[in-house]
Amino acid sequence: GDLLITRAGPRNRTGVICVVDGEPENLILSDKTVRLSYLRNFVNPHYVMTALSSPAMQYFVVDAMTGMAASQVNISQEKMKTFFLPLPPLNEQQRIVDEVSKIFGRIDKLNF
């Protein structure tokens, strides 16, 4: 359940976050990727992924990007540490994740 965030690359692929469930064998992270470990008793990784992927949080992610060309931008780990993420109680985090998953499930049905 670790979180991975791209911290460098093309503008549209920087700041992308995912949850890695399990422990993949022979995984080596690029220096352009940040791994977030967290306190499992307080944080649902899927909630963090959902929250950081939201349009409101993406505003802060894009604002933290530096670089002259859209083909190569960066977000420093120091900037990432300044992101403010609302952190409701764990049961509320799970409720939000469940609700968002239901909505995405409905969207997937419409697309296929």
Across the structure, where does each feature detected by a protein language model lie?
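Short, ligand-facing micro-motifs at secondary-structure edges
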Residues: L3-L29, H46, T50, Y59-M65, ...
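Structured core elements
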Residues: L4-I5, V19, R35, F84-P86, ...
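Generic, well-ordered alpha-helical scaffold segments in large soluble proteins
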Residues: L4-R7, A51, P55, E99-R106, ...
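A short glycine-rich beta-alpha junction/loop motif
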Residues: N26-V34, V43, M68-L87
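Short, conserved charged micro-motifs
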Residues: F42-Y47, Q94
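Glutamine-centric residue-chemistry signal
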Residues: Q58, Q72, Q77, Q93-Q94
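Amphipathic alpha-helical coiled-coil/heptad-repeat segments
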Residues: T82-F112
